[in-house]
Amino acid sequence: MPKLEEIEDYDDIDNMDMDLAELDPTLNTPIAPKITPTVVRSQDIEEEERKKQYAGSNKEMISFINPQTGKVEESAPITKQELDEVKKFQVLYPCYFDKNRSHKEGRRVPIEMAVENPLAKTISDAVREYGLLSIFEGDKCHPQDFGNPGRIRVLLKEEGKLVPSASKFSGGKRQLMKLVAEYLQKHPTTVESLRELPYGPDFDNIEFKKIPKVKGFKMNDIVPLHSPYLWGHPMTKSIYEAPKIEAPEKQFKAPKNKFKVVRR
């Protein structure tokens, strides 16, 4: 039986492209259709014009962590071929470092190195601190952890060789995950950590708070604002609602047979 630390080939399911809208087409997420804002700002108009400019072309936009500012920024439009190259990057999901999950449920580091409520943004901060090229995908989620959206793609190798920025990572992804786990332990997740995530104007009035955990349901109590756990969506709303108590049906009593006695 191999030890947990010796397992490396686990990218088959973890590398799936799954976003929140794919779980439920009616769910409004940062990549699903947005609710039209009542106040139209100039920057919103500029953003819309920029999207129209590349509509119908063979180019897409990706988000990345600016190593100088630490903020999530959008790249210049890239071609489908370039996007295919990006998909060869190593993938890190928050559930890899979740101490409340078993290996079968998505954890990939030893339990003593795992933490409570890991967030993709904190993982990206760790990767940036080690000087690695990374891409932040805030709308992607692990199939077993759809309530905690976000993942990081990290460039370690090209054509089987370590890239210059990853020259110290001869241990590959296992070594990287160990260092990321150490960073997460030094930077525990709090409600204030949610303010560091990039959000659009649709989230301006949403309160940062912990959410109640549901018994028997694997979930975190600190999740990004665009998590379906915070939206009261039908997909997850039922886990917070108390089951309706059905009134017992009234038993039907058969009528008594009445006899009339006639005396002669």
Curated annotation (Swiss-Prot):
Gene3D superfamilies: Signal recognition particle, SRP19-like subunit. GO terms for biological process: SRP-dependent cotranslational protein targeting to membrane, signal sequence recognition. Keywords: Cytoplasm, Ribonucleoprotein, RNA-binding, Signal recognition particle. Pfam families: SRP19 (PF01922). It is found in: Cytoplasm. Coiled coil: none annotated. The keyword DNA-binding does not apply. GO terms for cellular component: signal recognition particle, endoplasmic reticulum targeting. Signal-recognition-particle assembly has a crucial role in targeting secretory proteins to the rough endoplasmic reticulum membrane. It must be involved intimately in the translocation of a wide variety of protein substrates. Fungal signal recognition particle consists of a 7S RNA molecule (scR1) and at least six protein subunits: SRP72, SRP68, SRP54, SEC65, SRP21 and SRP14. PANTHER family: SIGNAL RECOGNITION PARTICLE 19 KD PROTEIN, SIGNAL RECOGNITION PARTICLE 19 KDA PROTEIN. This is Signal recognition particle SEC65 subunit.
